[in-house]
Amino acid sequence: MTDVGSDVGEVATLATDKGPREVPSRVLVVCAHPDDVDFGAAGTVAALTDAGAVVSYCLVSSGEAGSDHLTIDAAELAALRHEEQTAAAKEVGVIDLTFLGHPDGAIETTLALRRDLTAVIRRTRPDVVITQSPERILDRIFASHPDHLAAGEATLRAVYPDARNPRSYPELLAEGLEPHTVREVWLMAHPSADLRVDVTDTFDRKIAALRAHQSQTAHRDDLDEMIRGWLTLNAKAAGLPEGRLAEAFKVVPTA
């Protein structure tokens, strides 16, 4: 749910458990694999783009390890997952995607990855970065894929201190990528979420985005029910009215 002011001086807001929240002008979403953003934040992304925010995606890997079917080779699967993520992004109003090409299943918090992420941050110049939590959740191990943890940690390090420090990766300055300070990071799947975004009105588009990942979701006849269940729990935890759906984040001030 978004409210867009019609009078001069009014600003677009997101509906959250903390009340209306001003919509950031630019948002960057960084995830380890294609489909991660759609499971974690596609409803929020749709609400943001509806309200006028410019949202960009950065996928650390191409998802080439994301299939148990060995009849498709890694390069073919990577190309397919690029297509699926591009189609999914369009469902929620995103057309700017960057695929970094780091190895699926072997993402590490390296200086090379931090440099790549710093370059994307400086190019897109977001107010808010949405990424995966770097904290392992031992009672929900599926939420703690090693690639997710590494992507989240590398993103936090790229946000602070790398992206704002002109002495970090001086070659980026030579490419015209000036330092940039991100205002906030929103962490998905964090055990201590403190912001829930009401995505009731964008739920159908979230599902459409997830359905675009046919290689990952075609077998899930219960996808709608499963996702609705997760989002209902988020909304109830935040005290939102019965029937509302929410995506949850941990907000980290970084300015």
What function would you assign to each model-found segment?
Residues M1-D127, K250:
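Active-site rim/loop-helix segments in enzyme catalytic domains that contact anionic ligands
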Residues T2-L28, E108-A255:
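Metal-dependent de-N-acetylase/amidase catalytic core
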